[in-house]
Amino acid sequence: MSSPALDTIHDQTGEQDLHQEVQAQEHLPVEPTPEVQEEPESDHQDDDEQPEAQVLEQEQEQVAEQERLQDQEDQDQGAELVSQQPTAEEQEETRDELYNEVFGNQGSEASDLSDDEDVRMDEGEKYVPATATSAAKIPKFKKSKRDDEDEDEDEDEDEDDGGERRRKKKKRAERRRQRQEEEDEDEAPVLDEATQRRLALEERIDAIGKKPKAIRRKKKGDDDVDIVDSYHDDICARLRDRMIAAADKDEAANRIKMPGTAKLAMLDEVMGVLRNTTLWQSIVDNGVLEAVKRWLEPLPDKSLPSVGIQKAIFEVLPKMDLDTTTLKECRLGPIVLFYTKTKRVTPAINRQADALVQAWSRPIIKRPANYRSRYIESQNEVEQSQGGGGTGGGYSQSQRGPGERKFKRFDVKKALEENAHRKGARLQIVQDVQYTVAPEPKTHHHAEEMQHVSRIQQDNKKFNRFARQVKTKKH
């Protein structure tokens, strides 16, 4: 147990120790602590403006230094140019050379062009270049007279010099054009890719709107052969040989009971050439149609070629304008006629072959190709021609001679009188009839008997109209 006296002693000793520590700290050297003091706003602004002013001064010094260096470089270059400046003699020689290039000198091409006059400079006169105070002095040109002998010689040499002058003039024009093109290329601005593409597109659009230039074919001769025609002929000749070889391969494969695929393999290539309209004349000239006939012919076992081959060829043949002479040479008519008669082809191919036969046969039988002017015989005209002994040959009544017997047409009234005693009605027998001639239209049948009926109907219409008008007036 602690007494109050002991507590008092401990408190006193603690206070003494604390007092001694404070005194010891006071005798130690005091270190200054950084104190943050508030400064007025004007001081801060001065501190900010001071570095900005320093930066501006540095920039001005740099600019002045650069200008000084540039002036020094200009002075050095000027001194070099002065040292390299040509002398007066060199300038005079350069001007003389330029003058000779522009106006020509002795021995140049331009000096050979004068026939009736000789141009020369006066002796003692020279070209004086222009100066700061005086203009350039150009020498005078005078016409010198020739002797009569020289004139006679020139007249004899006119014909020989004419061709040479034209050649030299053409060469000079060509060189002038080349120089102009080079100058245009140098002066042309550099364009980016987008601008170049746009200009190219505009040029193509303008070219489409313009009319194409007529291409004149060269006349074929010993030394002058049209390259395009010869190229087309080579293509068609090679194609004909390959088509015949493919047909031979398929026939050989058919004989050994194997499928023939040679023609199918090159069908696309053949159709690409046959559809090209620019090659049609070469196709006819080089016998490609004979190879087409080989492709359409039946195989040794009497089988027909592939349906794809038939369809492709019969689609392109009507587009080719083949005349009678060409059809005789290529022998394509008999095979097309065979496709109109056989029943082993599709109806579409049969119709196409029939249309080809009709189109190719019109020039032979002297029939026009225009359907509007085409003439069709009627049944009445056929009967009349038969009744006249077959001499009419399909002529109309107006074209018949006066001595020919006129065939009497079917009399309806007489037929009704003959069948009047018959009782009952007979059923109509419907038959599938294929007409070889055009039947008589029903509108013209019994036309004479129906004329009075039409007159009565017209009179009735007039009377009804008149009756209506009278009624309206009464009301």
From Swiss-Prot:
Bias (Basic residues): 165-178
Gly residues: compositionally biased ranges: 386-395
GO annotation (BP), single: poly(A)+ mRNA export from nucleus
Region (Disordered): 1-195, 379-406
Record has Nucleus as a keyword: yes
Subcellular location: Nucleus
Record keywords, A-Z: Nucleus, Transcription, Transcription regulation
A GO term from the CC aspect: nucleus
Composition skew (Acidic residues), residue ranges: 36-51, 148-162, 181-190
Domain of life: Eukaryota
Disulfide bridge positions per record: none
Domain TFIIS N-terminal: 290-367
Biased composition (Basic and acidic residues): 8-20
Coarse class of the protein's main subcellular location: nucleus
Magnesium listed as a keyword: no
Function: Transcription factor involved in RNA polymerase II transcription regulation. May function in both SPT15/TBP post-recruitment and recruitment steps of transcription.
Family classification: Belongs to the IWS1 family.
Protein's recorded name: Transcription factor IWS1
Source species of the chain: Cryptococcus neoformans var. neoformans serotype D (strain JEC21 / ATCC MYA-565)
